[in-house]
A protein has these predicted regions:
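Short, glycine-/aromatic-enriched active-site segment of Class I SAM-dependent methyltransferases
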Residues: 161-183, 188-195
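Conserved S-adenosyl-L-methionine
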Residues: 199-210
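C-terminal helical/coil "lid" or tail adjacent to the Rossmann-like core of SAM-dependent
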Residues: 211-240
Length: 266
């Protein structure tokens, strides 16, 4: 690749991720709801980011059964992709606005239950599910082991808890502090959390290798901040497909995200 093109791609990645040096301080001193890197994914959630949304779905979908509890549902855009294959869906959040909107969205739908849920906590749902999905949630919870134990209590024996978390403390920066991240995980630290909750592991690996490199560079420049929406399309069209192509043939040594499928004992 010509040097000029490399520099333009790097600049686009860094602009997408932002930096303390270039981005005004907007933090109001209060932790945001359990959105985590969902703040990034809010920018990657529209039509301009179809590749990224497909990346998430393709990673998670093979592990989703017929009944699903989603933790940290936001407005429900991710779980709605599974609606046609589920006979029971529980959506949840700990943000009052999100819970209100989810309640309105699913009013009158007897196959969907809406919960106001802040883990760790006792979970009361109509029946057990075969799958839990938590996208960018666990990193907000100090007692992450207990949170997984609470979730396991409402999963059928042999069921799965699908976990998507930000990876590697070397990537921890202003963004993480602003959104209330307690930590970023490595496969080793996430394994310790999952096994500490009494769960087995089917899948555990870092993903989004190129995104991890860009995030690291942004932190080195002064702290990863909020994404520049103008560059989301560039990221989606160039970085996401390239990352996916690499990860089809090579297991990356690290990544922006750590992905895990935990198994509830039979």
């Amino acid at each position: 690749m010509p040097a000029a093109k490399k520099n333009s791609v790097t600049s686009a990645l860094l602009g997408l991720l932002g930096s303390r040096r270039d981005t005004p301080e907007t933090f109001d001193g209060e932790e945001q709801p359990a959105a985590g890197e969902g703040q990034l994914e809010n920018h990657l959630g529209g039509d301009e980011a179809r590749n990224y949304r497909q990346y998430e779905y393709d990673m998670v979908a093979p592990h989703v059964g017929k009944s699903l509890l989603e933790v940290g549902s936001g407005l429900g855009h991710f779980s709605e992709q599974f609606a046609g294959r589920l006979d029971y869906l529980v959506v949840s959040d700990n943000d009052a606005y999100c819970v209100e909107q989810l309640t309105k969205r699913y009013a009158g739908n007897g196959d969907v239950e809406v919960l106001d849920l802040a883990l760790p906590a006792e979970i009361n749902i109509r029946r057990k599910v075969d799958t839990v999905v938590m996208m960018n949630v666990l990193e907000h919870i100090k007692d992450d082991v207990q949170a997984l134990k609470d979730l396991a209590s409402v999963v059928e024996p042999g069921g799965r808890i699908v976990i998507w978390v930000p990876g590697y403390m070397q990537l921890y920066g202003d963004f993480d502090r602003k959104v209330g991240h307690v930590t970023r995980y490595t496969p080793k630290t996430l394994e310790a959390t999952v096994t500490g909750a009494g769960l087995g592991i089917d899948v555990l690996k870092p993903i989004n290798f190129l995104g991890g490199i860009a995030w690291w560079l942004a932190v080195r420049r002064g702290g990863a901040g909020y994404p520049d929406p103008k560059l989301v399309k560039i990221y989606d069209r160039t970085v996401v497909p390239t990352t996916r192509a690499i990860e089809r043939v090579v297991r990356p040594p690290f990544g922006q995200t750590v992905f895990c499928v935990a198994r509830v004992p039979e």
